[in-house]
């Protein structure tokens, strides 16, 4: 299977009553060792400003650019660890480029700049991530748990959280609710 890096994983409707029900995951890394992604459509209930104040990184008052933005639940793995997915800006101590225009940063130095003129143009913050061991994601796709589509910056950063799964599914060109997770064999 080709790498799914820089793709969205769309949870099939059959994944109901699971952690990943109606989830949309941005795949940050996918190789022979496994895969890692950030769920981008489940708000945690924590506002970015509150997180920065709890970490004593916020200056008062917080600039309007981050006001109201929510921290996301990135996935069930390491939920205490923060990830910042952002447009390219190479000045943080622990940033990994994903594409020419997107990076994933795990260092705290980026947080102190959010809301200032030093912040990336577009960003989202997530706690935790979704991870798969070698071959696990490929098997889940074969089991019809996930569909994939190319990621877009617009869907990552500009669309409301609650609309992301449906809009990603609509980009496939058919009604996801009409799909069955059962596969036939001839």
UniProtKB/Swiss-Prot annotation:
Cysteine pairs bridged by disulfides in the record: none
Domain of life: Bacteria
Gene3D superfamilies cross-referenced by the UniProt entry: VC0467-like
GO cellular component: cytosol
Pfam families with a match to the protein in the record: DUF179
Family named by the database record: Belongs to the UPF0301 (AlgH) family.
Name recorded for this polypeptide: UPF0301 protein swp_3600
Source species of the chain: Shewanella piezotolerans (strain WP3 / JCM 13877)
